[in-house]
Each structure stands twice: as C-alpha cells, then as structure tokens.
UniProtKB/Swiss-Prot annotation:
The keyword Flavoprotein does not apply. Belongs to the RAG2 family. This is V(D)J recombination-activating protein 2. The keyword Zinc applies. Core component of the RAG complex, a multiprotein complex that mediates the DNA cleavage phase during V(D)J recombination. V(D)J recombination assembles a diverse repertoire of immunoglobulin and T-cell receptor genes in developing B and T-lymphocytes through rearrangement of different V (variable), in some cases D (diversity), and J (joining) gene segments. Keywords: Chromatin regulator, DNA recombination, Metal-binding, Nucleus, Zinc, Zinc-finger. A zinc finger (PHD-type) spans 416-484. Zn(2+) 1 binds at C419, C423, H455, C458.
Amino acid sequence: MSLQMITVRNNTALIQPGFSLMNFDGQIFFFGQKGWPKRSCPTGVFHFDIKQNHLKLKPAVFSKDSCYLPPLRYPATCTFQGSSESEKQQYIIHGGKTPNNELSDKIYVMSVVCKNNKKVTFRCTERDLVGDVPEARYGHSLDVVYSRGKSMGVLFGGRSYMPSNQRTTEKWNSVADCLPHVFLVDFEFGCATSYILPELQDGLSFHVSIARNDTVYILGGHSLANNIRPANLYRIRVDLPLGSPAINCTVLPGGISVSSAILTQTNNDEFVIVGGYQLENQKRMVCNIVSLEDNKIEIQEMETPDWTPDIKHSKIWFGSNMGNGSVFLGIPGDNKQIVSEAFYFYMLKCTEDDVHEDQRTFTNSQTSTEDPGDSTPFEDSEEFCFSAEANSFDGDDEFDTYNEDDEDDESETGYWITCCPTCDVDINTWVPFYSTELNKPAMIYCSHGDGHWVHAKCMDLAERTLIHLSEGSNKYYCNEHVEIARALQTPKRTIPLRKPPMKSLHKKGSGKILTPAKKSFLRRLFD
C-alpha cells in the first residue's frame, strides 16, 4: 500500500465531505460538489484528472437530451450493466442532499453516449418509481444483484428528516434512521417493493455494502437511535424466479464495528476497507481485506498504511473509491497557519497493479463519509445555473480553453463582493430575491467618483425601481453616497431677486394729493 499527497490545482472548494467518484472505463469523474453549479461548469460533474500527483478538475459534457442532475452529497451509487451495447456501463444515483439541505428521492441513470480522446459525453435520465417508493434519504446503499438472467436493485438503510408532523422550528433539520426495510427496485419497469426482514431490527446508515451475483453483504454502519456502531454482518440473498422475488437475510459472524468506511476492489474476489470511524470522535486507522469465495465472506486485518502525522491527528476524514484499488482521501487543513488550505488530499493505492477491466465485478459500497454535524444544517447554497448552454461544449477548442480559475475568481470579485458595510450577500447562502435573478445577484452601478457596483437588495430597491433604472440612462447613487451626490449636484436654495417690470419705468407716477392746510401754507409761502 502506498500513500501519496495530491495537489489540487483548481476548484479546491468544490471537494467537500459527501462527494462521489464514478469510474467509466478507467476515467474518473467527480460528482457531488459543494453548492450549486456555476456557469463555468453548469453540469456540476467534473473529470477527475490526476497526473503526477496533481489533480485537475475539468467540466464534463452532457448530451442535449439529458435531464438536470443536481449536485447530491451522500447519495447511494452503484454500477449497472445495461442490456444494449451503448448502455454497457451505467451509474445509478439515488437520494442524497442538495445544496439547499433538501433530501432527494429521485433515481438518476448516467451513461456514456460518446467518447473520444478529448472528452466524454454523458446522458442522464431520471427514472420514476411506482409501488413502495423509498422516501428521500442519504447515507444509504444501493446495489444491483443478478439472478436467473434478471437484475434488481437492492436499497437499504440511510437517514431522513423527521416526519413533517414532528418537525419543529428548533429541530427542523433533525434526522432519524430510516426504517430497516429492504427495497427491491426494478430499473427496467420502475417498480419498487418493500420487504421487512426480521433479522434487521435497527436502521443503519453509512455502512459498507458488497454485491456479488445474487447476494448483498451489509457490514458495519451507524445506528443513530442507539448511537452505536454494531459489529454486524448481514447476508441478503435475492432470488428472481418468473413470479415474485424471494428475499432472505442471514446474520453472519465475523463483522467489524465501523461506519463511513470506503470500499475498493483490488481483484476479482478481494476488497479492501479503508478509513471510517469506530467511535464518534475516533477514526479507524486499521484497514481490512474482504475475501469472497464460494458464497463465503472472510474479513481480516491487513497491513496498515504509513499514515502521515496530519492524517493521524485530524479529527475527521472523508473520501471515495476511485476504482482499481485506489482511494481518494481528504482531511481538514491546519487552521493555525496564516495561509493554509481548506483540505489536504491523498491517494491511497491498495495494490501495485491496476485491476483489469475484465476482472472487475460491478459492486458498490456506501462510500460517502459521515459528516460530524449531519444533524444540523451544514451546507449552504452557491450560484445556480442551468440552461441550454450547459450542453454547448461542442468544439474541442472551447473545451480546452475552459478557465479553470473562474470559480475562484468569481468568488472573490464580481457579484460576490461586499458592496457596503451592511452587505449580507454571501456566495454560500445567496438565493434569488428578484424575479430577474437566476444564477447571480442583481447589481446596480453607483456613479459616485470612479463608480462602483452595489447589490440591489442591499440598497432596498424595489423590483420596479430596479427595472426602471436599468432601462434608463439616469445616474444612480447608492445609500452611502446619495447625500454626497445631493450636496455636490443640488445648489443651495436662495431667494430669487424681484426685478420690477420694464413697463413701470416709463409709467407716469400718480400725483400727490395735498391737504387744504398744506395748500394754504404753500400759498402764503410763495406770496
């Protein structure tokens, strides 16, 4: 086993606990970013390109007939063999958390429709379910079993929000274990059936699941109701005759106590369990090798990797399976440093030789790691954009000239600035306020001095006023500079001078009226 540190060259902030990695014929793709996708990559799926220990995230391309795939963290994912050649390998995605902290109950199917040396084009379709539809959840597992030439999805575990009649303002985001029901999902006809097995008494989440032919093994997990990580090992076997499916569960010895572990396949019959937690605040540093032979499962400890001091002393870690016996791990950065990364990333190779594609069986584990604060609202929204331009990466030149630093630049300047002392617009919490907003906040230009941009919402502008100002050519001054602008532009009020009309200058004045006494005096004076 070898451990290598990985340097992320761009979009580091997108990689957060709960992401998933999908391996399509040796090419790895990242799914489940933090926040809503931005316009530079509206699909939210990135090519996970690692070369010489440097990771580069490149935007993936979807066909125009694809449905919208929101960024989902802590979903259940598994591979599925389609019937046609174009659907040779598919990924099934169910559940998960959106950036708005909502839980999804939808099923998405991702497949490759075009592949060349430059890029891979995906198609995403949404499947509707009827029957016993599983409730929205996260931290669960989804596997595909094959029996008698048929296939069926097996869904189990996870967490969901409290029922609506029990949710209060103080505990609105409180979660609980889902009922320990096993769901069989027919992806071809969109039917789901729920089964109650007496061996499964408590709900589990963040467990490990391994599918082999007609059998699914459930290992470990965390029970939120009892706050324990039972060392249980269940074997769920599914028989698919012409009639109704038959399902049974057996409790096996030899389980281990672990939650949020990552499972990777090293060869046709062996898997490696990496990471996870054995207590709430204690990571599980031991790795295990799982062997499957003749419908038997054996779990043994294996050589422990040479963990770095940063990994040993970190309180949490997270990651996902890269396929071919490799695991991608992340730990929080050192906040004590003046300039530090938010996360440090590593790649653990559990085998020296890559697994050949023909030897790879389509198995899955619940590889999303557990968030220490998953009972609280732990994620906020980012910029959201989805339009026809999401599928407009038609030319190779345009794909190659993608600005990889656009995500970081936009978060520091442009629409996400602090426009005034009372500005509360945050890239992580912003939601549209005006009807004209879609993927960024509305802004207006202040003409004071050299000019600067301010958010319309921070200026308390009504939508009608905002539209009027945007259509006209009038100058606008923000709340901070409006008084200064008035003092500079509005003259002081002065009393206007009253000028007599010109006609009055030529008008003959009225004669004076003399009293009889004055007339008598003047008469005597001149006499």
